[in-house]
Design a protein with these regions (language model features):
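Loop/turn elements at helix/coil->beta-strand transitions in domains of secreted/extracellular proteins
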Residues: 14-15, 99-102, 127-130
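Structural scaffold positions in well-ordered secondary structure
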Residues: 17, 33, 77, 104, ...
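A structured beta-alpha segment of the ubiquitous adenosine-cofactor-binding alpha/beta core
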Residues: 2-7, 62-124
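Conserved small-residue-rich beta-alpha loop and adjacent elements
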Residues: 9-48, 55
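N-terminal Rossmann-like NAD(P) cofactor-binding subdomain of oxidoreductases
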Residues: 86, 105-164
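Glycine-rich phosphate-binding loop and adjoining beta1-alpha1-beta2 segment
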Residues: 38-79
Length: 238
C-alpha cells in the first residue's frame, strides 16, 4: 500500500487518545478511533480492565485465558496499567492527559475528580483538548441526581422504551445477544468526537462531550416516540 493511500485509510493518524474507559461502550468507541489511525493508549487498573475476564474466554497456547471482548475491542491499542490512587500514578495520568488530543472516560460522574484528576482543569491548560465522559444518565450538570445512579446497558434499553418495543407475544423484553446499548453509545461517542475534531480544525478550540447511554437509546427510538405523540386512536392510519 502506498504512503498516500495508507494516509487516506487512516485519517486520524497522529491523533493521541488517552482512554480511561472500560467494559464495552467506551472501548468500542476508542476501537473505532484506533481503526481510523488514532494512537489509543488504554489506561487500565493494576488488575486489568474487567472486560479481560468476560466470557467467552479462549485458552491461549501458554494456557492463559483471553476474553473475546478484550480481543475484539482493543486491537491496535497500546495499554498501560496504573494505580491512579497513588500520587505517582495520578501524576503519570495527568502528564498523559496534558499531551493528548482526546481524553475519554467512563467512570461514574465525579469519580476522576475524587482521584485528583480534573479534566476541566486540563482543558483550561490546553484549550484544544477534547474530553469525553460516558455514563448511564450523564453528568451532574445535565442529569442532576440521576447522575448518581449506576447501571448497565439493559437499564438504558428499558428506560428508553427500546426493550418494550421489541417485546415478545407475552409482553416480555427480549434477551439481547448483542450489547445494543453499549455499541450504540460507543458509536455515538465516536461520531461526537470526530465532529468535535472538525470543529477544532476550524476554531482551534476543543470541548467537553457528555454522553448519556439512556439518551443515545432515546435517539434510536425517535420515530416511535414522535409517532406516539401524533397518533390519533380515533382515526388510525392503515
Amino acid at each position: 500500500m502506498s504512503e498516500s493511500v495508507h494516509a487516506q485509510s487512516q485519517p486520524l493518524r497522529g491523533v493521541k487518545v488517552v482512554d480511561f474507559t472500560h467494559v464495552l461502550a467506551g472501548p468500542y468507541c476508542t476501537q473505532l478511533l484506533a481503526d481510523a489511525g488514532a494512537d489509543v493508549i488504554k489506561v487500565e487498573p493494576m488488575v486489568g480492565d474487567m472486560a479481560r475476564f468476560m466470557p467467552p474466554l479462549g485458552k491461549m497456547p501458554d494456557g492463559s485465558l483471553l476474553s473475546g471482548a478484550e480481543i475484539g475491542l482493543n486491537r491496535g491499542k497500546r495499554s498501560i496499567a496504573v494505580d491512579m490512587k497513588s500520587p505517582e500514578g495520578r501524576d503519570l495520568v495527568i502528564e498523559m492527559i496534558d499531551t493528548a488530543d482526546v481524553v475519554i472516560e467512563s467512570f461514574a460522574p465525579g469519580a476522576l475528580l475524587k482521584l485528583g484528576i480534573d479534566l476541566g482543569a486540563a482543558r483550561l491548560r490546553r484549550p484544544s483538548l477534547i474530553t469525553v465522559s460516558i455514563s448511564l444518565y450523564g453528568s451532574h450538570e445535565t442529569a442532576g441526581e440521576l447522575a448518581n445512579r449506576k447501571g448497565l446497558a439493559i437499564i438504558a434499553e428499558a428506560e428508553s422504551g427500546v426493550a418494550w418495543m421489541h417485546r415478545d407475544a407475552a409482553g416480555k423484553p427480549p434477551q439481547q445477544k448483542v450489547p445494543f446499548a453499549d455499541m450504540n453509545t460507543g458509536l455515538c461517542a465516536y461520531s461526537a468526537i470526530v465532529t468535535a475534531m472538525l470543529g477544532r480544525e476550524r476554531s482551534g478550540e476543543g470541548k467537553h462531550i457528555d454522553i448519556a447511554m439512556v439518551k443515545t437509546m432515546l435517539s434510536m427510538a425517535t420515530v416511535s416516540i414522535v409517532g406516539s405523540q401524533i397518533y390519533d386512536a380515533d382515526n388510525p392510519q392503515p
